[in-house]
């Protein structure tokens, strides 16, 4: 198991211990959810389709009108270096989720850029592949595409959290399926 004191996070050009990773309390990503993100994963220690994820991150940045202080290539290099710093913490059977987040920053400041790795809980979830995962259709609806583009990965996931709480009240371990306002299937709350 990866310990927080052993792993590193990239924050604004520096690689810091996870336990020392902080952002300002007045950051818009914290106070208003004013941030974008993308998530990719590794397979056998290699990041899968990183360039495509970075492209999507920049599409979300454009939608939210946040200017990245880093180029696509700089983020790609930073992500690879972060993985190099953290890969030794995993066994050869383990992999990472890699999260890239860019906040607007505080109202009088610059965007904050965070890249961090989280071990994939593959062993804990192996039972899902054998026996399935309990699901329920939530009464909580996905944010309307008229209010917020579903193509942009933004830090607005409170409806997913509420849907998961509803699913947990339905059955322990259950995940939620969210519909749109017209009753159409949109997506699951995550696993």
Regions found by a protein language model. Name each.
Residues 1-177, 181-184:
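Conserved alpha/beta cores of soluble small-molecule-handling proteins
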Residues 187-191:
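Glycine-rich phosphate/ribose-binding loops and adjacent secondary-structure elements
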